[in-house]
């Protein structure tokens, strides 16, 4: 296990990241990959959104500035479901360069884009083991995962 000392954690997602300990999980209603919050559980730590959102740049798909209703699109008959052109993610946007002692929480897609562009990802983390409330809404996670 690797431990970073004197680490500052910045959350570069658009929402807070709330961390719970394993004891916060309702073992009667949870299974691996589908963790449910126990009644009365309180978070261990919350990382507020930093204000900067690291993301992956989209390549392909529909041109910028085209309103969804004006796009040329395929349809999935007979349901009349619009189908847009595919996109891929290439490169990152608003992802700072690595800084000693600073860990960055990013989305899975931003982390994968950083890895694909050859960035050193030792400082990048995503959420792991999502925790949901009784209604199924995501309320936090049990850990962070390194971007490999």
Predicted regions located by residue number:
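Intrinsically disordered, low-complexity segments enriched in small/polar residues
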Residues: 5-148
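N-terminal amphipathic/basic-hydrophobic helices that include classical n-h-c signal peptides
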Residues: 1-3
């Amino acid at each position: 296990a690797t431990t970073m000392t004197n680490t500052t954690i910045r959350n570069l997602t658009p929402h807070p990241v709330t961390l719970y300990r394993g004891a916060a999980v309702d073992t009667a209603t949870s299974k691996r990959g589908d963790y449910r919050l126990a009644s009365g559980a309180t978070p261990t730590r919350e990382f507020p959104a930093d204000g900067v959102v690291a993301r992956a740049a989209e390549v392909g798909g529909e041109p910028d500035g085209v309103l969804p209703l004006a796009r040329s699109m395929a349809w999935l008959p007979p349901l009349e479901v619009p189908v847009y052109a595919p996109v891929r993610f290439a490169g990152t946007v608003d992802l700072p360069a690595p800084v000693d002692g600073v860990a960055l929480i990013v989305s899975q897609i931003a982390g994968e884009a950083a890895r694909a562009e050859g960035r050193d990802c030792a400082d990048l983390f995503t959420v792991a083991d999502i925790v949901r409330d009784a209604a199924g809404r995501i309320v936090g996670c049990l850990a962070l995962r390194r971007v490999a």
